[in-house]
Amino acid sequence: MDEDINKDTNNNNNTTDSNNNNNNINEDEIIFNNYINNYSNYLNNNGISALDLLIQGRDGNNNIITFCSEIDQMLNGGTPLKKITEICGVPGIGKTNMAFQLLVNTSIPFDLGGVQGKAIYIDTEGSYSCQRVREMATHLVNHLECVLLKNPMTQTTYIPTVETVLNSIYYYRVYHYIEIISLIHQLPLFLEKNKDVKLIVVDSITYPFRCDFKDMGLRTRSLLSLAQNLMNIATRYNLAVVVMNQVTTKISPNQKESILVPYLGESWTHICTYRMVLFWKQKQRFCHLYKSPSFKSCFTPFDIVEYGIRDVGFNHPPPLNPEDQEQEKEKEKRKKKNNNNNNNNNNNNNNNNNNNNNNNNNNNNNNNNKNNDENEMYIEN
């Protein structure tokens, strides 16, 4: 009797396994068929040539600068659009400050080398500081006004205010990896209505995935799906994606030393287009361009000061109060007026000189005519 029960149980288990296998096969067939159909649709559309891609790269929008010229130079002009850039480092090194600087710099006008757009900040750790962002926005506006005062010939029709900069930043707070996956999945609906968004910052990508996953394969699949969606969004909507990553300790095989490596493992390493590692060296902050498809690996120092990310030793002009701004504008007006008056006086002098020259020429012509008449009279006599 027991043997019959065991046989029935084994048969049921085998039937269940067979059903599961059949379900898996059916799911695989559905996925395969969908992929084949989508691939056929891709082939039906006209492709794009390498020359067109090159022209698009040359004629594309400006990069998002960091206000550290050495870092911008490493990236050939700043944080690139249509790419995923990862910034990783130990706590307190300046990752969040770098994120805040990129957020406010997204508002820089086209005429001054910016992208003149808006930004999305996805906060997973509660790191956002309204006061710090407002401080950076104030110094950004002051910097742009100083640039215009020093270069009055600069042609621009738009200078943002502090309120405009802050109003251009959309903030989202998430607490769980399912929330961030859902948010990224729904972002295209938001971006269709807000096509001037040029930056998405995730600070940090690490925190939602540091919880203990019972299935590490699930974590890897979730990360890959999230990264794929971010890459599609960056390419489709012509914007930059910047993700912050923490570091963890890795023990060497011989168990004699340990090193700090970016979190999330090797699979995540191949996802990002650029990787910048921030680190300390002799009490100085450094930025190391660790991974890049087109630039060599290099590093440069940078500072975090009251007004944001800057070059080491950079002297920022003092902020202008409203009275100083009015005085500077009046000086510029007087200078332009004096230049115009001088130009008018020079033109008048030139006209007078031309008139004098014309009079002299007329006198010379009259004298020549008189001499000719006298000579003719002499010949006749």
Curated annotation (Swiss-Prot):
Where in or outside the cell?
Answer: Nucleus
For this protein, the parts annotated as crossing the membrane are none
InterPro entries from the UniProt entry: DNA_recomb/repair_Rad51_C, HR_Repair_Mediator, P-loop_NTPase, RecA_ATP-bd
Q: Which domain of life is it from?
A: Eukaryota
Q: Listed GO molecular functions?
A: ATP binding; ATP-dependent DNA damage sensor activity; DNA binding
GO cellular component annotations, sorted alphabetically?
nucleus; Rad51B-Rad51C-Rad51D-XRCC2 complex; Rad51C-XRCC3 complex; replication fork
Q: Which SUPFAM superfamilies match?
A: P-loop containing nucleoside triphosphate hydrolases (SSF52540)
Question: Which positions does UniProt annotate for ATP binding?
Answer: G89, V90, P91, G92, I93, G94, K95, T96
The record's Gene3D superfamilies line, in alphabetical order, gives: P-loop containing nucleotide triphosphate hydrolases
Ranges in coiled-coil conformation: 323-377
Kindly state which keywords UniProt assigns to this record, in alphabetical order. Answer: ATP-binding, Coiled coil, DNA damage, DNA recombination, DNA repair, DNA-binding, Nucleotide-binding, Nucleus
Q: GO biological process annotations for this chain's record?
A: meiotic DNA recombinase assembly; reciprocal meiotic recombination
Show the ranges annotated as biased composition (Low complexity).
8-24, 339-370
Region Disordered, annotated ranges:
1-24, 313-381
Family from the record: Belongs to the RecA family. RAD51 subfamily.
Q: What does this protein do?
A: Involved in the homologous recombination repair (HRR) pathway of double-stranded DNA breaks arising during DNA replication or induced by DNA-damaging agents.
Q: What is this protein called?
A: DNA repair protein RAD51 homolog 3
Q: Which gene encodes it?
A: rad51c
